[in-house]
């Protein structure tokens, strides 16, 4: 199973608006065995013979919290230029769709966001937010999606999503760490859910880049994790990760555990 998605020259039709399943990402073959470093980092390599594109995917422990960093880089190892209009990690095989229980058990948590109404979190059944409840088996063409255009990356939604399986008692969560255009897609493939976080693409952001032989392009930074429990447990793991990442040497977490932001919430920006 590929743990990335890359695309070039894709046909853009309505039923192909989901980001997964395009060439050459769909047909790339793995190169060698995954490389594991100290039990905290794993690297996968893929190659497409037709285009000469090579993709390197690295997952590594973030240090605090049940969170992984995902890095994806595509390099043109061929002899001709190749234009890339989508590159991103993808987290497949998350929760089973084989039984009909997912219709009542799978919840999606997401946050609408504007300047005067920040972090408005919603808890919805995923079948009510884009995923077809009549899905039977195999791949589903329906999906849940958030997106943002431009440099105000939280203008409509926070670049985060939590997929909660209440039947299994676990949650998967993902955060895009980027200040430009992005999209977050949750769908079904091979009887399981996937999460696909992405930076700007040709469809979302009018972005593409032509790679000459030897040139590379990297995906936007992404954090991903899985934990037992629901929304609160997922947010707790992301909070541990953020505090350790933003303030790695600060002892204020023990002495000052609350961060109070009065910019918009109290002073109305005055």
Residue ranges of predicted features:
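Polysaccharide-binding surfaces and accessory modules of carbohydrate-active proteins
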Residues: 1-189, 205
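Conserved, mostly hydrophobic/aromatic
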Residues: 72, 214, 260
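Short, surface-exposed, low-complexity cationic segments
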Residues: 72, 225-237
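OB-fold single-stranded nucleic acid-binding module
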Residues: 84-87, 209, 229-234
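Active-site beta-loop-alpha junctions enriched in small/polar residues
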Residues: 179, 224, 263-265
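Short acidic, Pro/Gly- and aromatic-enriched capping/linker segments at domain boundaries
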Residues: 192-212
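Short Pro-Gly-centered flexible turn/kink motifs
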Residues: 209-228
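An acidic-aromatic substrate-binding cleft motif
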Residues: 233-270
